[in-house]
UniProtKB/Swiss-Prot annotation:
NCBIfam families: PRK10452.1. One of its GO terms (cellular component) is plasma membrane. Belongs to the drug/metabolite transporter (DMT) superfamily. Small multidrug resistance (SMR) (TC 2.A.7.1) family. MdtJ subfamily. The keyword Plastid does not apply. This is Spermidine export protein MdtJ.
Length: 120
């Protein structure tokens, strides 16, 4: 459970960092760029700890996929960016992919004592 919390923190900091990049580009001052640097750095740190127990492919897909989903939603709400039918279809496809990746991931089972291993 702890590693999933780290992954959630990685996703949240990635979203914050990316949105602050946009905020900095439309505003004045360096605060947005500093916030971006800190948040994206934290995002990678959290992600690197999360992949200790979460499969890399799953963690990365969730990190990037959920990040893109929320960045798009917040970009529409905060920066008045357009959300076309094609973008909506892409986001729905992304969500379906995230669900399939997560549901297709098996937890490693306990090794059976005395189980034979196949040799080639």
């Amino acid at each position: 459970m702890f590693y999933w919390i780290l992954l959630a923190l990685a996703i949240a900091t990635e979203i914050t960092g990316t949105l602050s990049m946009k905020w900095a580009s439309v505003g004045n001052g360096n605060a947005g760029f500093i916030l971006m640097l800190v948040m994206i750095t934290l995002s990678y740190i959290f992600l690197s700890f999360a992949v200790k127990k979460i499969a890399l492919g799953v963690a990365y897909a969730l990190w990037e996929g959920i990040g893109i989903l929320f960045i798009t939603i917040f970009s529409v709400l905060l920066f008045d960016e357009a959300l076309s039918t094609m973008k909506i279809a892409g986001l729905l496809t992304l969500v379906a992919g995230i669900v399939l990746i997560k549901s297709g991931t098996r937890k490693p089972g306990k090794p059976v004592k005395g189980a034979a291993r196949a040799t080639i």
